[in-house]
Curated annotation (Swiss-Prot):
GO terms for biological process: defense response. Pfam families: Toxin_3. Residues 86-87 form a propeptide. It comes from Centruroides limpidus (Mexican scorpion). Has the structural arrangement of an alpha-helix connected to antiparallel beta-sheets by disulfide bonds (CS-alpha/beta). It is found in: Secreted. This is Toxin Cll5b. Residues 1-19 form the signal peptide. Residues 20-85 form the LCN-type CS-alpha/beta domain. GO terms for cellular component: extracellular region. Beta toxins bind voltage-independently at site-4 of sodium channels (Nav) and shift the voltage of activation toward more negative potentials thereby affecting sodium channel activation and promoting spontaneous and repetitive firing. Keywords: Disulfide bond, Ion channel impairing toxin, Neurotoxin, Secreted, Signal, Toxin, Voltage-gated sodium channel impairing toxin. One of its GO terms (molecular function) is sodium channel inhibitor activity. The lineage of its organism: Eukaryota, Metazoa, Ecdysozoa, Arthropoda, Chelicerata. Disulfide bonds join 31-84, 35-60, 44-65, 48-67.
């Protein structure tokens, strides 16, 4: 029983360490999600934790939302073959 708990704890830790991070990106425009309040930012945190993003924490860094703990399926900036187009 103790071995099973130890293995589970190790796997959870590995998943946390290897989690993806990066700037949130708008898939239709290819642009980063912008923000103005640097550091702890309620809007960035909310966007990162949204069900379609799946992140664990978000904050404003260099005037864009940076997310930590993202699944590999969530795209981050820059998108391959798509540059930011502000239309």
């Amino acid at each position: 029983m103790n071995s099973l708990l130890m293995i589970t704890a190790c796997l959870a830790e590995i998943g946390t360490v290897w989690a993806k991070e990066g700037y949130l990106v708008n898939k239709s425009t290819g642009c980063k999600y912008g923000c103005f309040w640097l550091g702890k930012n309620e809007n960035c945190d909310k966007e990162c934790k949204a069900k379609n993003q799946g992140g664990s924490y978000g904050y404003c860094y260099s005037f864009a939302c940076w997310c930590e703990g993202l699944p590999d399926s969530t795209p981050t900036y820059p998108l391959p073959n798509k540059s930011c187009s502000k239309k």
